[in-house]
Amino acid sequence: ELPKLNVNDTVRVRIIAVGVKHILVELYGKEVIIKAEDLQHTYIVNCKDYYVVGEYLKVRIKQIDITNNIFHLSAKDFTINPFQYIRKYIEVGGEYTGKVIAFPKQNSGIIVQLDNPGITCLIRVPAKFNSYPHYLDKVLIRITEIKEQKKLIYGYLMRVI
């Protein structure tokens, strides 16, 4: 079955293990890792919150090289892209509530998941804040920039609720 597969083919795979930032699936007897960024359009903190061992998942083959054992699968094509209609829910200058879900290493700030559309934003914490927000704290933020093509939303922290 593997030699018959081509790029852009749609296949159904079974989840055999779930990690924090990836899942392990079985593709016609071959074990393949799918990273969290290839599963959904939004930021995934923990894959265990979304996927369960034994579930089946519809994926598209992005890259396949059987001789070198290279497989790149993506489930993004079969999920709704919330950034496509993001300006219906969010506007620049608007204030929104969300919860702190991560602290990125390469960028300064925090990652906040908004309550309403369920998307994530990179938020700056102003220097005037004495107490830095903690994991899962509820916060009020103001949006400063929306980049639909890059799937990025920026803002700054107003206050911890």
Regions found by a protein language model. Name each.
Residues E1-I161:
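Single-stranded RNA-binding regions, centering on S1/OB-family and related RNA-binding modules
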